[in-house]
């Protein structure tokens, strides 16, 4: 799958537990805008309405000369057994459903979603500390040898 747009905050704010691929119901101008990479997934999330899954807060910029709602909810297309599994995990383990990236597979726009658990501020601080320590160790070893 060719990745078009990534949710850059997903791996920093959440601990990814499971991944799924879903299709998205889009309008023509939305497809063109996504292919031109005019979309933001930061702050986007998925929610259940009945037995259907929807993507919310994904902002697709208007394509040239088109008019429409840029931040409407979009239905996600998945098999029923996948939806049941996601709903069961979400309820029992109290997980969030977040979009990871939008890609193109066989000229069709696909969304990679994940069941994720939110990280605390302490977890994020520790992650930053570990990253800095690794960077400094690599820098020291580079200068040492």
From Swiss-Prot:
Location in the cell: Cytoplasm
One GO BP on record is: trans-translation
| Disulphide bonds in the chain | none
The entry lists its GO molecular-function terms as: RNA binding
Sorted alphabetically, the keyword list is: Cytoplasm, RNA-binding
Which PROSITE patterns does this entry report, sorted A to Z? SSRP
InterPro entries referenced in this protein's UniProt entry, alphabetically: SmpB, SsrA-bd_prot, SsrA-bd_prot_CS
Entry keyword annotation includes Transmembrane: no
Pfam entry (one):
SmpB
State any GO CC term: cytosol
Q: Does the keyword section mention Cytoplasm?
A: yes
NCBIfam families hit by this protein: PRK05422.1, smpB
Homology family: Belongs to the SmpB family.
Q: What does this protein do?
A: Required for rescue of stalled ribosomes mediated by trans-translation. Binds to transfer-messenger RNA (tmRNA), required for stable association of tmRNA with ribosomes. tmRNA and SmpB together mimic tRNA shape, replacing the anticodon stem-loop with SmpB. tmRNA is encoded by the ssrA gene; the 2 termini fold to resemble tRNA(Ala) and it encodes a 'tag peptide', a short internal open reading frame. During trans-translation Ala-aminoacylated tmRNA acts like a tRNA, entering the A-site of stalled ribosomes, displacing the stalled mRNA.
Listed name of the protein: SsrA-binding protein
What is the species listed in this Swiss-Prot or TrEMBL entry? Mesomycoplasma hyopneumoniae (strain 232) (Mycoplasma hyopneumoniae)
Q: Which gene encodes it?
A: smpB
């Amino acid at each position: 799958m060719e990745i078009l747009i990534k949710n850059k905050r997903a791996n920093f704010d959440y601990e990814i537990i499971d991944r799924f691929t879903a299709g998205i119901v889009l309008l023509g101008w939305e497809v063109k805008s996504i292919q031109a990479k005019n979309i933001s997934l930061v702050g986007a999330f998925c929610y259940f309405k009945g037995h259907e899954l929807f993507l919310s807060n994904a902002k697709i910029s208007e394509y040239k000369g088109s008019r429409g709602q840029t931040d409407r909810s979009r239905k996600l297309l998945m098999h029923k057994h996948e939806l049941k599994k996601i709903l069961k995990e979400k309820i029992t383990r109290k997980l969030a459903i977040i979009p990871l990236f939008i890609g193109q597979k066989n000229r069709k726009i696909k969304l990679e979603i994940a069941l994720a658990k939110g990280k605390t501020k302490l977890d994020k601080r520790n992650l930053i500390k570990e990253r800095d320590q690794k960077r400094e160790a690599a820098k020291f070893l580079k200068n040492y040898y």
